[in-house]
């Protein structure tokens, strides 16, 4: 898996101050996408143990509320194994931090993924530039916010 960039403290991609990992690789190629440079899975840098150490260093700070995974698409097929390993490791190492994940896939098509038990919030659905929204943390009105409470997923 490759990644485009890491924000050590971001207030846009979820609540509070968050560490944000932008992965590369996306099949959706949404018209009007803000992160077109992340579509090609070969772009960016290789995700390595040093990347995990960098994320851990940022996540260890008390003012960090959690980790946000975006891109690209964290659930791009070639990213799934690495993302699964990452979210399980983050939950074990930093159980007090929440994990938010943005994906172009609909929740109904990914709900069977084992890794989702480690994720607290999913924003699902492709970005649709013709469906503007005022909903917090969504790029378009079709996108839904799914919350995981004790293994039960509900959307707004």
From Swiss-Prot:
Binds 1 [4Fe-4S] cluster. The cluster is coordinated with 3 cysteines and an exchangeable S-adenosyl-L-methionine. GO terms for molecular function: 4 iron, 4 sulfur cluster binding; [formate-C-acetyltransferase]-activating enzyme activity; metal ion binding; ribonucleoside-diphosphate reductase activity, thioredoxin disulfide as acceptor. Keywords: 4Fe-4S, Iron, Iron-sulfur, Metal-binding, Oxidoreductase, S-adenosyl-L-methionine. [4Fe-4S] cluster binds at residues 26, 30, 33. Pfam families: Fer4_12, Radical_SAM. Coiled coil: none annotated. S-adenosyl-L-methionine binds at residues 32-34, 72. It catalyses: glycyl-[protein] + reduced [flavodoxin] + S-adenosyl-L-methionine = glycin-2-yl radical-[protein] + semiquinone [flavodoxin] + 5'-deoxyadenosine + L-methionine + H(+). Belongs to the organic radical-activating enzymes family. Activation of anaerobic ribonucleoside-triphosphate reductase under anaerobic conditions by generation of an organic free radical, using S-adenosylmethionine and reduced flavodoxin as cosubstrates to produce 5'-deoxy-adenosine. Forms a tetramer composed of two NrdD and two NrdG subunits. This is Anaerobic ribonucleoside-triphosphate reductase-activating protein.
